[in-house]
UniProtKB/Swiss-Prot annotation:
GO cellular component: cytoplasm
Catalytic activity: L-arginine + H2O = L-citrulline + NH4(+)
Stated name of the protein: Arginine deiminase
Listed NCBIfam families: arcA (TIGR01078), PRK01388.1 (NF002381)
Species annotation: Lactococcus lactis subsp. cremoris (strain MG1363)
Keywords from the named record: Arginine metabolism, Cytoplasm, Hydrolase
EC main group: hydrolase
Biological processes, Gene Ontology terms: arginine catabolic process to ornithine; arginine deiminase pathway
PANTHER family linked to this entry: ARGININE DEIMINASE (PTHR47271:SF2)
Superkingdom field: Bacteria
Cited Gene3D superfamilies: Arginine deiminase (1.10.3930.10), L-arginine/glycine Amidinotransferase, Chain A (3.75.10.10)
Amino acid sequence: MNNGINVNSEIGKLKSVLLHRPGAEVENITPDTMKQLLFDDIPYLKIAQKEHDFFAQTLRDNGAETVYIENLATEVFEKSSETKEEFLSHLLHEAGYRPGRTYDGLTEYLTSMPTKDMVEKVYAGVRKNELDIKRTALSDMAGSDAENYFYLNPLPNAYFTRDPQASMGVGMTINKMTFPARQPESLITEYVMANHPRFKDTPIWRDRNHTTRIEGGDELILNKTTVAIGVSERTSSKTIQNLAKELFANPLSTFDTVLAVEIPHNHAMMHLDTVFTMINHDQFTVFPGIMDGAGNINVFILRPGQDGEVEIEHLTDLKAALKKVLNLSELDLIECGAGDPIAAPREQWNDGSNTLAIAPGEIVTYDRNYVTVELLKEHGIKVHEILSSELGRGRGGARCMSQPLWREDL
């Protein structure tokens, strides 16, 4: 077991990774709540769990320790009832509850459970019919609040452990998630990082207590000095500049360059890693749809300036920008779906660009994106194909479903 965080690249040998096994929360999605919960379809839980177990076993078979966030949270709350009560208070306040009949009823209900069951219930959500709470307000009896079946909504996106936090060097960002459906996920991370002995003294480059948003799918660690961050539907440019200032100023950080890549702001391309991932020292997957007809895309190189400020250089050529910040003479951009006008968007939608490198030139990715998989193999990449029929319904692939905690340095 490697304590703390050590992630200085996207491609170093993966030694430890944070996961969440899909649970009852997935079965609490309905057609009426799919959009609110950021899903386009409802996965079949039994098969999704089998697929996730296959994914986790693939990682273990290739030398990675699999760590489950729900187990870490259980360990933290079992160790300290005070921490558990503080977490529940924080959770309920963020859900809009204040001390009173419902708040007290939820607190009593959750604290009466064994800690493991409580953590599972936080992920699964608390239905209104689970508690005998007298409803006295009109909002409890009529209108949109009354139509909601839950006191606490489920967290079905939690198996995408990439986004609530991001390992970066020896530290981590704990992220202000864009949509309410995901915000409790990073609250769980906050309590784990602050209280689990495994992460004692781990620096937090940026916590979740901000008004501007960022998500881990937009945060890529290119090498020990350079990170790429997407300007996307889920991550704001203001956040990127503020994080760059922190990374440049903090003596525990080794980063001196941030590459900000602006991608289309839409659901299909919600994060940078849905359209661009690093798979070797000089090889990347890319979805060509992020560029305009002339092949241009807005790319910004941020470096330390005077008096704690940031200097910004604007380019419109992704390949040239990558060569510049990585000091490469050549690099290989491998197009999702081989750049075909039909195969590329189809396979990007099914996370063909969302690969997880487990070593230089060795990746894990969904089996369904066969055009991209064959092209990757032609380019010399070793590909571990994982099952995808149900997991992919949540709009995330192998990188989305994993948060590296420890990679070997290159």
